[in-house]
């Protein structure tokens, strides 16, 4: 019998009347089960968190940081054990899975240190109005309250930790809703916080069926802030449900790599392949299309093709570069995009092969803007080359996307690179590097349908706190 994992609620590990079985995407093996919470159980989670917040926010930043450092140490200690489970649960290469756990520990440590550095300020009224020179404002940041953190399947530990740590160090309490496929990993993350000795109710987990609690956990009046990573349609729905409450949304992307004629093509090819095919393309920041000057396209396609042909395809425990996609629905969607490109005349440089959820890397040249692959986010190991004749055309195609997460520009002309970066409608532009999240002290954000709000440790702390001003009139 497989293990029954429990939710961490108000300092206790709890089962529910119903459960959800979790299976490995690569093999179909049953990995265990997680509780399927009811709405009444969600009520208890939120009530417990609310009750714990007063004492938690009363602690100093230094005291809260001690708990976070302990949790980070535990994650580092157990990185290989947790990584092995994570690798099976989401079909991620073992080394990458362990790396995700380690990076999460690093984020938690950094968040603890960043919180300790937070400072308030004192303002003098006379700086604006001579008649107010006797007024002084003390400005501080305060926690928003209860943060609902919703993490995605592709980084169920890292993109949980990047929400939890800034929230906790700020004096907030947290309810983590991990993805169904990734929920075991999320509960293992919770074990680290539990062992670190956080006071009961400060950090809690919620697992369950979307049909039962999906909207309920978001709409609940107890929630003060919603921090979500996932698809754009779900993010838009959450935004509607949130009403006037603040939200952080990290959503989809269609990141372009723009390759100019003077670019180092070996460097570009290396970054394109790493950016497009890492974790089988299941990353919001993956390179999802290459906009290349026609005069150098043949050379670049040849270099990229050679590197793609060297990628290994197989199982996560073997550290294969390309592993099975998260489920059959995802693989079917990717296949649909590929067939559309085939039917409309794209050149298949590396042909489509599929075995179950495992899709071998696919490379297309001569993709045109009437093809779905030019615009839709595949979340799979397929990359389209779109040939362009000018910088202006590349910018125009990139900006026509409904998404605006990131872009890359490869060129040795740095004044031109900055000029292009200014015109691209995205949150981040990488020069001579692949699109990617991080480092985690940098701001991370999306324009248009790629998100709302700014992440990055310091920015997340600011987002999950609110400013309070106390004004003294010393003349009185």
UniProtKB/Swiss-Prot annotation:
GO terms for molecular function: glyceraldehyde-3-phosphate dehydrogenase (NADP+) (non-phosphorylating) activity; lactaldehyde dehydrogenase (NAD+) activity. Pfam families: Aldedh (PF00171). NADP(+) binds at residues 151, 177, 180, 215, 230-251, 377. Optimum temperature is 60 degrees Celsius. It is an enzyme of class 1 (oxidoreductase). Optimum pH is 8.5. Coiled coil: none annotated. Keywords: NADP, Oxidoreductase. The active site is at 250, 284. The keyword Oxidoreductase applies. Gene3D superfamilies: Aldehyde Dehydrogenase, Chain A, domain 1, Aldehyde Dehydrogenase, Chain A, domain 2. Induction: Up-regulated by the catabolite control protein A (CcpA). Homotetramer. Catalyzes the irreversible NADP-dependent oxidation of glyceraldehyde-3-phosphate to 3-phosphoglycerate. Is not able to use NAD instead of NADP. May play an important role in NADPH production in S.equinus. PANTHER family: ALDEHYDE DEHYDROGENASE (PTHR42991:SF1). S.bovis does not display glucose-6-phosphate dehydrogenase (G6PDH) and 6-phosphogluconate dehydrogenase (6PGDH) activities, indicating that it does not have the hexose monophosphate pathway. This is NADP-dependent glyceraldehyde-3-phosphate dehydrogenase. It comes from Streptococcus equinus (Streptococcus bovis).
């Amino acid at each position: 019998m497989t293990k029954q994992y429990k939710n961490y609620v108000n300092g206790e590990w709890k089962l529910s009347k119903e459960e959800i079985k979790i299976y490995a995407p690569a093999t179909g093996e049953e990995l265990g089960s997680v509780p399927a919470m009811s709405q009444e159980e969600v009520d208890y989670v939120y009530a417990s968190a609310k009750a714990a917040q007063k004492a938690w926010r009363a602690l100093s930043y230094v005291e809260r940081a001690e708990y976070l450092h302990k949790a980070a140490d535990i994650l580092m200690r157990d990185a290989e054990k947790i990584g092995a489970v994570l690798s099976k649960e989401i079909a991620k290469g073992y080394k990458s899975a362990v790396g995700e756990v380690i990076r999460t520990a690093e984020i938690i440590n950094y968040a603890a240190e960043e919180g300790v550095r937070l400072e308030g300020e004192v303002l003098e009224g006379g700086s604006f109005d001579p008649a107010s020179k006797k007024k002084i404002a003390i400005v501080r940041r305060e926690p928003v309250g209860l943060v609902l953190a919703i993490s995605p399947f592709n980084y169920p530990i890292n993109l949980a930790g990047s929400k939890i740590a800034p929230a906790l160090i700020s004096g907030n309490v947290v309810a983590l809703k991990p993805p169904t496929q990734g929920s075991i990993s999320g509960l293992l993350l919770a074990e680290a916080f539990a062992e670190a000795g956080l006071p009961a109710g400060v950090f809690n987990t919620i697992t369950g069926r979307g049909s039962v609690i999906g909207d309920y956990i978001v709409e609940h009046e107890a929630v003060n802030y919603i921090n979500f990573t996932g698809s754009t349609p779900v993010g838009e729905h959450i935004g509607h449900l949130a009403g006037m409450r603040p939200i952080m949304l990290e959503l989809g992307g269609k990141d372009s790599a723009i390759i100019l004629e003077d670019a180092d093509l070996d460097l570009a090819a290396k970054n394109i392949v790493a950016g497009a095919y890492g974790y089988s393309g299941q990353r919001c920041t993956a390179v999802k299309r290459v906009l290349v000057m026609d005069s150098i396209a043949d050379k670049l396609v040849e270099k990229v093709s050679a590197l793609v042909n060297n990628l290994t395809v197989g199982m996560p425990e073997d550290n294969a570069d390309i592993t099975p996609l998260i489920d059959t629905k995802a693989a079917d969607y990717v296949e649909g995009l590929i067939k559309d490109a085939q039917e409309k005349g794209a050149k298949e440089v590396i042909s489509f092969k599929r075995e179950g959820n495992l899709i071998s890397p696919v490379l297309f040249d001569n993709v045109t803007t009437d093809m779905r692959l030019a615009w839709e986010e595949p979340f799979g190991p397929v990359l389209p080359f779109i040939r362009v004749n000018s910088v202006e055309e590349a910018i125009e195609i990139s900006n026509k996307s409904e998404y605006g997460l990131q872009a890359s520009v490869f060129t040795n002309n740095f004044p031109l690179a900055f000029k292009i970066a200014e015109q691209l409608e995205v949150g981040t532009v990488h020069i001579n590097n692949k699109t990617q999240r991080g480092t985690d002290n940098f701001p991370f954000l999306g324009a248009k349908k790629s998100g709302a709000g700014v992440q990055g440790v310091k920015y997340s702390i600011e987002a999950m706190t609110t400013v309070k001003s106390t004004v003294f009139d010393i003349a009185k």
